[in-house]
């Protein structure tokens, strides 16, 4: 480990933890999307695919900072337990809430104390995206539980993912630029 990494040991460990978590979330949400399509919840599948792409962006950003600090980014991808789409949405929401309420705030506090602007930036981008994922998962759960047959969870739909920070939106008209990193809206990836 380089001197730079040694000086930021706690932040590097937090980055590794976040990298592994986001890498596993990508794998999990990809598997959940397949199950949602099988159950004909194509809108929920679109949401899982968009969230999976965002998590992939987060893991890439975390890995970049780890390498910048002289560390190595390696993730152990765990087997995914796939259940019903409703159960998968609830599991995804639980994971997002943990990241919002605990993990990323703690990691941001440590990075801020160490004045590590690159870590602050990658953690902030991930945290803000997780907030939109949690909102969207909550909406999907409510629609599934409510049993509305015309709800968006049944038909494939577009979601918009910032290629820089992973911010995710469910509407094209929301922004001219990413509200988190200022990336131009026209660069957003459309995920269906």
Question: How should each PLM-predicted stretch be described?
Answer:
Residues 1-192:
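Non-heme di-metal
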């Amino acid at each position: 480990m380089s001197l730079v990494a040694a000086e930021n040991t706690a932040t590097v460990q937090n980055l590794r933890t976040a990298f592994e978590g986001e890498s596993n979330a990508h794998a999990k949400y990809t598997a959940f999307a397949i199950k949602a399509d099988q159950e004909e919840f194509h809108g929920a599948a679109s949401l899982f695919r968009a969230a999976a792409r965002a998590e992939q962006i987060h893991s890439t950003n975390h890995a970049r900072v780890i390498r910048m600090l002289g560390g190595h980014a390696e993730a152990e991808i765990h087997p995914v337990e796939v259940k019903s789409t409703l159960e998968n949405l609830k599991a995804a929401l639980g994971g997002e809430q943990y990241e919002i309420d605990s993990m990323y705030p703690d990691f941001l506090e440590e990075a801020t104390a160490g004045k590590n602007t690159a870590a602050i930036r990658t953690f902030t981008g991930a945290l803000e995206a997780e907030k939109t994922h949690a909102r969207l998962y909550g909406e999907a759960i409510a629609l599934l539980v409510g049993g509305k047959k015309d709800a968006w969870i049944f038909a494939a739909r577009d979601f918009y993912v910032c290629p820089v920070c992973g911010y995710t939106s469910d509407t094209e008209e929301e922004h001219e630029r990413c509200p988190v990193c200022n990336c131009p809206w026209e660069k957003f990836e459309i995920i269906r």
